[in-house]
Amino acid sequence: HRMDISTISHEIRNPLTLIYSTLQMIEASNPEVLNIRHWSDLHSDIEYMKQLLEELSAYNNGQRLSPSSTDFDIFLKKISLSFASSIIETDIEFISRIEPELPVMPADSIKLREVLLNLLGNARDAVLIQQSTCSNHLDSACNCESNRSLDTSKALTYSPQIHFHAWKEHSNLIISVSDNGCGIAPEHLSSIFEPFVTYKSSGTGLGLPLSRRIIEAHGGTLTVHSEPDLPDCQLKTTFTLTIPIP
């Protein structure tokens, strides 16, 4: 029998909610438990489980689309503004270029928004990691172990950038998300779209597999390219979405 992940997730989520409620009741009647070592870890672990269950359900439903007429010029500009506002308190330079005459065509805008914000969020994480590494005078965090003579003057002037570009090419809509962050190690490139594979300190490893699944359900492709970009071994990573125009 085919395993219904959504049903399993629902069955697990119910007792998980009860556990969380019980913890809150214990804290309310016995505030001293907040001082117990690792008590806060319980909340973190439960939140992680809830996130995992939500992403499992989303992954299971990734190929089920609810398409509607979508004006990609308006749609992508809204995403650009939304992301720009989320990083306004950082030093990240966000460069958005939405070319004119993008198509109006059927698409699941809710799921595509999820994909694009996930890719932009990953880019944000990558440049912030790189910025933190540089500000601490450490070796480049770009998986370049051979470079032990990092020019700290360059490290201190590191300028995080994220590029969001959309254009029409022949009969395809192309959207790319690029960053000059910490990059992806060559040995990891072939596995980042596999479920539960993650090279972050946190995360479920379902974000990129779900993103690719959603794009493929639209008849498109999601690819990644990561290569050395600057002399101090910063890497540039680009994720490219290609969606056919009907």
What kind of region is each of these model predictions?
Residues 215-216:
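Detector for a conserved hydrophobic position within an alpha-helical segment of the HATPase_c
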Residues 36-86:
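Conserved DHp (HisKA) dimerization/phosphotransfer helix of two-component histidine kinases, i.e.
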Residues 207, 211:
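Short alpha-helical Gxxx[C/S/T] motif in the catalytic ATP-binding
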Residues 1-9:
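Conserved HAMP-HisKA connector
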Residues 134-171:
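Short beta-strand/loop element within the Bergerat-fold HATPase_c
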Residues 88, 93-103:
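Conserved catalytic submotifs in the C-terminal HATPase_c
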Residues 184-195:
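Short conserved segment of the HATPase_c
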